[in-house]
Amino acid sequence: MKQYSKTISTSFDFLDNFRLAKTDDERYNLLLEEIDDTDVDDYHGNIEQLLFNYDYGHGTIQNVEITDGEVSKDGKGVLNVEFEVYYYFGCDDYNRTDEDNMQIGVSINFKNGEITITGVEEQERLPDEY
């Protein structure tokens, strides 16, 4: 089994505001803002970069959206993510888009100021038979 994760450095403001939040909804909204504000490059956000690690059978992911989730005061939670997998078959001049989703685990390390997002476990691909 293989599982991918990504660690995101956070700001001290985020950690302070998270600790002061009174409800799980407030904490959830703060988490979403922090993940969106810490894009690693100009093209792909943190969730997308985590999803790129998984095998979609020659498909590429697009239109990633966090649909809901929850996070508790201790910094543990989940995010439900929906996305599309786009396939282009050049030889047939044909394309297809499938909808998919993944539940992503969230863990905030208050001491180190980091958020770790973790995808689902998947079977490792077996070698092709000859």
Please tell me what each predicted stretch does.
Residues 1-56:
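N-terminal trafficking/processing presequences and adjacent post-cleavage segments
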Residues 73-87:
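A short hydrophobic beta-strand element
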Residues 107-111:
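Short beta-strand micro-motifs enriched in acidic
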Residues 117-130:
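Short, solvent-exposed aromatic-acidic interface loops
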Residues 84-98:
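Short, cysteine-centered beta-strand-loop-beta hairpins and adjacent loop/turn segments enriched
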